[in-house]
Amino acid sequence: MILNREFYKRDALEVAKGLLGKILVREIDGVILRGKIVETEAYIGSIDKASHAYNGRRTERTEPLFKEGGIAYVYFIYGLYHCFNVISGENDDGQGVLIRALEPLDNFDYISLKRFNKKFEELSTVKKRDLTNGPSKLCMAFEIDKKDNYKVLYEKGDLYIEDSCDNYDITQTTRIGIDYAEEAIDFPWRFYIKDNKYISKK
């Protein structure tokens, strides 16, 4: 069952925790890819110097952050990579959740060929973990890029998120790669499924 619209109309911290264990579904040329969300980070623009929307900063790039929760926000970094975020909250809240890592669930050869031009069985143990254990890696594996910006995630299409009833132990800690963010460096707004081998960093 697809997560409904109301799921996303909450605080980014709630959504970030709630997304753990949920299933990201991607359809590419008739192939269905599914990945369990195992690591997330919350960003709350009004108080968060790590957020693209800090202090109400509103540009063409950050506009998705100010929409109602339940759409995709995809941005480009370092001129090379994409990052996939889920918008949370109400209109004008400036909140979102970065999807940091997935555990691939099926079509392993398809994903492996996308990432490393090899079949899954040909990959080393390290390379198998590297398929989707980071925000840009999962975007490459699932072909998520700027064309997916603003996509609605609570309706069936080529990118959406399904519910899951499984329960997990969750670790809460600080976020990664935000050394510029002053006091926000210490906000414990990263969440991951404990002991999952696909998380980007403990």
Curated annotation (Swiss-Prot):
Coiled coil located at which positions? none
Which InterPro entries does the record match to this protein?
Formyl_transferase-like_C_sf (IPR011034), MPG (IPR003180), MPG_sf (IPR036995)
The catalytic activity of this protein is classed by the Enzyme Commission as: 3.2.2.-
- UniProt record similarity statement: Belongs to the DNA glycosylase MPG family.
Q: What does the entry give for GO biological process?
A: base-excision repair
Keywords, sorted A to Z? DNA damage, DNA repair, Hydrolase
User: What is the official name of this protein in its record?
Assistant: Putative 3-methyladenine DNA glycosylase
| GO molecular function terms attached to this record | alkylbase DNA N-glycosylase activity; DNA binding
Q: Which PANTHER family match?
A: DNA-3-METHYLADENINE GLYCOSYLASE
